[in-house]
Each structure stands twice: as C-alpha cells, then as structure tokens.
Design a protein with these regions (language model features):
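Helical hinge/lid and interdomain linker segments adjacent to catalytic or ligand-binding clefts
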Residues: 32, 39-120
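Short, solvent-exposed loop/turn segments at secondary-structure junctions
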Residues: 37-38, 90, 118-120, 187-190, ...
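Extracellular ligand-binding/catalytic regions of CAZymes and related secreted enzymes
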Residues: 25-27, 34, 45, 49-57, ...
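A glycine-rich, often tryptophan-bearing local segment used as a flexible ligand/cofactor-contacting loop or short
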Residues: 91-161
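Catalytic beta-strand/loop cores that center a nucleophilic Ser/Cys/Thr
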Residues: 25, 133, 138-214
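N-terminal export signals
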Residues: 5-23
Length: 251
C-alpha cells in the first residue's frame, strides 16, 4: 500500500472533524519545527507530508513545516495556533526566542512534541517544565505491545485497550508524572527488561501523555521513529486528535 493510500484510508474512516460549534472557525496554522542540532531522523520529510495531508483531510488545520529559527519571535508565533517539535539537541535559540515560545504556550496556545522532542534542550530547565520529561535511551527497537492507559480519554479511546507497533521505544527520565496525564504506556511484558541499557523507574515507560503549561495544552508522543508508524492510520488519527485538542477544537 502506498503512502497516499494510507492517508486516503485514514481520511475516509477515522479522521476527526472539528466540533460543529466551531465549524466556521478559520484554519489553524500549526508550525512544524524540525531543526536537528543532533541526530537527524530520516523520517522527517515523510512526517511533514503526512501531517500536511492530515490537515487537508481534516479541514481544521494547516501545517507549516520549517527549520527557520526566525519563526520564534512574538510577532511570528502570533500567526500560529500551535507549535509542533520533531527536533534534537541544543537548538541555537536566543533567550528572547525561548521566552517567546514559553509565553506563546503559557498564554493558551498548543505545543506538541514528537519522538525526539524529548531529546532536545537538556540545558534549558524551562523546556523540561514544558514537555514533561527527557529522553533516556532506547533499549528496544522492535514490535511491542502498548497499553492504553486511559481508554476513556477522547484522544485515545478509539484504540481500545492496547495496540501493537514496531518502533524505536524510548525510556523517559525526569518525568513529571504528577503533572502529566499518561495516555499510552509500554506493556513491559512485551520486552526484555534484563538488557543493560534498561532503566526501570516506578512510573514505567510512558509513551504518550498530555499536560498543561500555563493556559496552554501540551501533547507528547515518544512514537514516530519509523516511517511505518507514520503510515499507520491509528497513529495518524492519534496525531489528528492531538492537534485538535492542542488547538482547542476538542475538549
């Protein structure tokens, strides 16, 4: 099945439309920022293409993909409803740009982090407060079972109780478990916990969560290394739901 066929499938059977009460709202612009100061993921071009198509199919948002740091000014950010990071490393943002991003989210806009967004800004404590945790290795790159931690949450209710995916699996350190609502977590029985690189923590292996930063809605998915994950209709629907939630088109 081609990428376009995957996208057509999800648009026809599982894409979510905005709430009727907000149907006349103009398209929300979402800044998809893919600057890689560290490892650069091969999947970035595919991810941008799929997100762009999801926005078109949904009819609620428009994706603007960029690596231009100039977008992070108060004036430029004002053109967007949300910012989405698929980034790595210590991005060379100025203190003014960092403050602009924090104020943007605090004031009620959305922030979404994908995969290596937690492998970003280790030396900026406010970023940890924003996203909720840091990447701490990926002991597994395989087919795993993923538990739906809150099957009643609208972002993941369509998944049932669990799903299987083949992807690079992150473990998270410094996780703000009290301030985060975990939506998906690794089923520990589906992996080898005896590997030397495994760090067992009391909160396990959260893979998808949502949280708030000031008045802003924050979403993070550790999934998304593999192109096959991006082409999966379930992942596409999850991201569509997350964008609609972060931009306040859904509760």
């Amino acid at each position: 099945m081609t990428r376009r066929e995957f996208i057509t499938l999800v648009s026809s059977v599982s894409a979510i439309r905005p709430l009727d009460a907000r149907a006349e709202r103009p398209l929300d612009r979402v800044l998809y920022f893919t600057y890689s100061a560290g490892y650069r993921h091969d999947v970035l071009p595919l991810s941008a293409a799929i997100l762009t198509q999801l926005g078109r199919d949904c009819g609620a948002f428009e994706i603007i993909a960029t690596e231009d740091l100039a977008e992070f000014s108060t004036g430029n950010l004002g053109r967007y409803a949300a910012v989405m990071f698929y980034t790595t490393g210590e991005i060379p943002m100025s203190s003014v740009q960092k403050t602009a991003l924090l104020n943007f989210v605090r004031s009620g806009h959305g922030f979404l982090g994908i995969h290596s967004a937690t492998d970003t800004f280790y030396t900026w404590p406010d970023y940890l407060d924003l996203i909720g945790g840091y990447f701490n290795g990926h002991p597994w790159h395989q087919a795993v079972t993923i538990e739906v931690a809150d099957a009643a949450d609208p972002l993941v209710a369509f998944l049932g109780s669990s799903l299987q995916l083949n992807d690079e699996v992150y473990q998270i350190s410094d996780f703000d478990y009290r301030g985060s609502h975990v939506l998906l977590r690794l089923d520990q029985s589906s992996v080898d916990l005896s590997k030397d690189s495994v760090h067992q923590r009391f909160y396990g292996w959260p893979l998808v969560w949502k949280r708030f930063f000031g008045e802003g809605r924050v979403f993070y998915s550790a999934l998304g290394h593999e192109g096959s994950v991006w082409q999966d209709p379930r992942y596409q629907r999850l991201l569509t739901n997350a964008i609609l939630w972060s931009t306040r088109r859904s509760a």
